[in-house]
C-alpha cells in the first residue's frame, strides 16, 4: 500500500476517549521490545510516526493513527516488561480487553511475535482474547534478519505449534530490510478495506 498520509490522531485509555468509529481499524500488539513500533513505522513509511520508548512498559496508552484517511492503525501498549511498575502491569489487561470487546470498527489485530522466542503467557492470553471476541488475528514474526534461513524455518514451526496454527499463517518481517512489508499490508487490507467494500 502506498501511504500518502500518516498522522497521529490521539491517545486514549478509556472508551469515552476513543476516536469516533468512522474508519475501519487494525490494532497492533505484542510484548515489550518485540519491534511493534518499527513495524508500524515501516508500514506507514515514516521513521518516527511511532516513537520507541526508552523505558519499555511504562507508557500505557492506546495510540490511534490515520492512514490515507481510509484506515486507522492502533498501537496498543506492550506487555510482559518485568520492570514496569505494578500498577501499570495491573491496568494493562482490563484496558486492552475493554478495547477489544467494545471497539465496533476493529477489523483485525496484528499479533507480533519475536521469531527468536517461543510465545509467552502474555502472547497466549492475547490470542485467547482474540478468539473470545471473534477478532481475526494476523501473525507477524519480527526480527527475521537475525536468524539464518534454516533457523527461521525451525522457529516458525515451533511458534506455529505453540499457538496451534498452520505455519503458512505466520508472516515474516524485518524492519532492517523491510522484507515482509507488502505481505503484511496485503493481509491488513484484506481484513479491513476489502471487508468495507463487501459491506457497501
UniProtKB/Swiss-Prot annotation:
* Positions with a binding annotation for Mg(2+): 37, 59
* GO CC annotation: cytosol
Give cofactor(s), names only: Mg(2+)
Asked if the Swiss-Prot or TrEMBL record annotates the protein with the keyword Disulfide bond, the reply is: no
- Pfam families xref list: MMR_HSR1 (PF01926)
Q: Which GO terms describe its biological process?
A: division septum assembly
Q: What is this protein called?
A: Probable GTP-binding protein EngB
User: Which source organism does the UniProt entry give?
Assistant: Pelobacter propionicus (strain DSM 2379 / NBRC 103807 / OttBd1)
- Identify the coding gene: engB
